[in-house]
UniProtKB/Swiss-Prot annotation:
Catalyzes the NAD-dependent decarboxylation of UDP-glucuronic acid to UDP-xylose. Necessary for the biosynthesis of the core tetrasaccharide in glycosaminoglycan biosynthesis. It is a single-pass type II membrane protein. It holds the Pfam family UXS1_N. Keywords: Acetylation, Decarboxylase, Glycoprotein, Golgi apparatus, Lyase, Membrane, NAD, Phosphoprotein, Signal-anchor, Transmembrane, Transmembrane helix. This is UDP-glucuronic acid decarboxylase 1. It catalyses: UDP-alpha-D-glucuronate + H(+) = UDP-alpha-D-xylose + CO2. Its EC number is 4.1.1.35. The keyword tRNA processing does not apply.
Amino acid sequence: MVSKALLRLVSAVNRRRMKLLLGIALLAYVASVWGNFVNMRSIQENGELKIESKIEEMVEPLREKIRDLEKSFTQKYPPVKFLSEKDRKRILITGGAGFVGSHLTDKLMMDGHEVTVVDNFFTGRKRNVEHWIGHENFELINHDVVEPLYIEVDQIYHLASPASPPNYMYNPIKTLKTNTIGTLNMLGLAKRVGARLLLASTSEVYGDPEVHPQSEDYWGHVNPIGPRACYDEGKRVAETMCYAYMKQEGVEVRVARIFNTFGPRMHMNDGRVVSNFILQALQGEPLTVYGSGSQTRAFQYVSDLVNGLVALMNSNVSSPVNLGNPEEHTILEFAQLIKNLVGSGSEIQFLSEAQDDPQKRKPDIKKAKLMLGWEPVVPLEEGLNKAIHYFRKELEYQANNQYIPKPKPARIKKGRTRHS
């Protein structure tokens, strides 16, 4: 009886022990699983952190490139002033891809206007204005002004015309057509849309002047059949057309008689004295002076001219206005100055005097000062240094086998091209 009771007691104890052992084993198993889970989770988290870190390292350069792209998009165009609809004008510039025209384009675009450039690229270059292509205020049209143009504008700056001797002597008939038929078409456009037109005339209307300095009331001394007559007489006729349209049709006109101008974007081989001397000095070639070099010229920097054109367009002055720098230099002095600024060892070579080369050229700008509040402000040496820097870059551009359009040489049977 007692033995049976003991057996039952031992059996009960064993069952409890087994349950306890099983419980302990189960707890140990759960603890082990939980430990493994925690450990695996830690490894996973560390792995994820490493992966995230690796991805971050790979993505950061992409983010940097995106930031650079965004920055380049916001800085794609030069800063443009915001103008209200009332103040913003629709402006047409013929010859706007040329030397002066492209600088005028920059000025009017940065002032906040809508600018349409028309050019046949005879002497103009697309890369002079390519930094504006795509801007909502800018349009570039490949068009020759000898053909009519139909467009809605408020102002017309009529600059289209070959302006350097090799260009207009190469094609004198085209030069005459541009200055006559082209001007007629632009005046017709101005009449149709009620626009104001500014004609870019020239100091060449004074010819080889017998009056010095030249004021706007001087009629000039021009050879009507000389090698440069296609340009000189073309501009004189263009002025006559402007005032005929003003008197008969009521067209608002402005006439700027532009004197020698220089600066970046001049053609390297356009035959003008500034470009000739700079190019020759940079290449170590002799600086060619026609005659004794005692002829005088007055040179203005292109930004001064552009400011004068804008001031004249927006003024009430309808009679011709001289725009030039009255600071006069002989051609020989000018050659020596450029030699010194370039640091060139070039010699100065004297050639026989050119046909119809004006002996003196200096503007009287009293009218511009009084009626426009305008006069040149850029010192000659400062402007020349900028032009020299530009020509250095152009020569590098050419040396890298990049194509630079060059004007074709003038076909002249008698005489030579003269200092311009």
